[in-house]
Amino acid sequence: MSKLPLLPTTVIGSYPRPKWLRESIRLHKAGKMSNEDLQEAFNDAVIAVFQDHYKAGVDVPTDGEVRRDEMVEFFAERIKGFKFYGPVRVWGTAYYRKPSVVSKIEYREPMLVDEFTFAKSVSYTDNLKITITGPYTIAEWSYNEYYRNKKDLVFDLAKAINQEIKNLVEAGAKIIQIDEPALHTRKEDVSWGVEAVNEAVKGVNAKLVMHICYGDYSFVAPYFNEIKVDQINFALKIYNYKPLELLKKYGFDKELGAGVVDVHNRKVETSEEVANDIRKILEYFPPEKVWINPDCGLKLLSRKIAYQKLVSMVEGTKVVREELKRKGYSVD
C-alpha cells in the first residue's frame, strides 16, 4: 500500500454499470454478442469506473463490481454445493435468483483473481480494494437443503472464502473487504457468526475490512472488537449518526469506516453537509482512526448521481483535512 492522506476516502464496492454495459449484457443473453465482446465490454466498464473514481478524487477505489449481478448469486455460481431453481420475489416486481445449498460446500477454483488482476492493471493507484461476500451473508441469503444446521454451512463457506482470500493476496491484493450485511440479522447467531468471519480471514496477510449495513447494530456491537479485521465500515448517514454512541459505549477500537453518503436517496449531499457530518464523527473518534465512505454500494443510483455524491464526499473531506492541518495534524 502507498501512503494515504488523513481521513482516506473510499467506496464500499458496487458502482452503477454504464448503460452500454447493460445493453451488452442484454445482447449477450439474447445470443447477439460473443463472449469475447462481452468481456471487452466488462473491461471497458471497469476502466470507466476507475475514471469516475479518479475524477472524483477517491483515495481507495474498487472496480465497481461491474462483473457481478448480485453479491450472493455471483459466489453461489462458483462454489460447489449450490443450485438455482428459479427467481424468488423480494418485493413488488423485484426478483432475486436465490441459491439453494444441495450438497457439501467445496472450493472449486479462484473466483475473483482474474477480476482483481485486470483491475490492478488499470487502476490509478495501488491502494485498490477488492470485495468478497462473507460466509454468514451467503448462507443467510440462501436456502439450506443439505446441512443439518446453518452453523455447519457457514463454517464450510468460511473455509472456501478463506481460500479465495489467500489466492487474492497471492495475486497482490493489499486491501480486502468482507461484506457481511446479514451478520446482525439474527441475535442468536451473532457469536458464532463472528467466529466464522474470523475463520474466513485466518492466516491472511493484508489490510482487512468488514462492511456491515442497515438494521439494528446493538446486538452485534459487543462483538465488534473480537472480529479480526483492521476496519469495520458502517452505514451511518441514514441513521443520522446515532450508532456512534453505541460504538463509543462498547469501546470500538478499530478503524471506523464512516458512511457519510445516503445511497438510497437521489438527493446529492453538499460538500459542506459532508464536512459537518465528518466533524460530528470526529467528536467520537480521532481522525487517524477514521476513513470516509458512502453508507453502502452505489449501484442502485444513476451513474451521474453516484459520481456527484462521490465528488461531494471527497470535497467535504478535504475541507475537514484543511481544518485539521491548521490544528497541527499531518494530513498528507
UniProtKB/Swiss-Prot annotation:
The Swiss-Prot or TrEMBL record describes its family as follows: Belongs to the archaeal MetE family.
An individual GO BP term: methylation
Q: Which PANTHER family does the record match to this protein?
A: 5-METHYLTETRAHYDROPTEROYLTRIGLUTAMATE--HOMOCYSTEINE METHYLTRANSFERASE (PTHR30519)
Q: Where, if anywhere, are coiled coils annotated? A: none
Organism, per UniProt?
Answer: Saccharolobus solfataricus (strain ATCC 35092 / DSM 1617 / JCM 11322 / P2)
Q: Which InterPro entries match?
A: Met_Synth_C/arc (IPR002629), MetE_arc (IPR022921), UROD/MetE-like_sf (IPR038071)
One GO MF term: 5-methyltetrahydropteroyltriglutamate-homocysteine S-methyltransferase activity
For binding Zn(2+), which residues are annotated in this chain's numbering? H211, C213, C296
The UniProt function text for this chain reads:
Catalyzes the transfer of a methyl group to L-homocysteine resulting in methionine formation. The physiological methyl donor is unknown.
The pathway that the record names for this protein is: Amino-acid biosynthesis; L-methionine biosynthesis via de novo pathway
A family per Pfam:
Meth_synt_2
Q: Which cofactor does it need?
A: Zn(2+)
The EC number of this protein is 2.1.1.-
Cofactor note as given:
Binds 1 zinc ion per subunit.
Could you tell me what this protein is called? Methionine synthase
Q: Main EC class of this protein?
A: transferase
- Keyword tags: Amino-acid biosynthesis, Metal-binding, Methionine biosynthesis, Methyltransferase, Transferase, Zinc
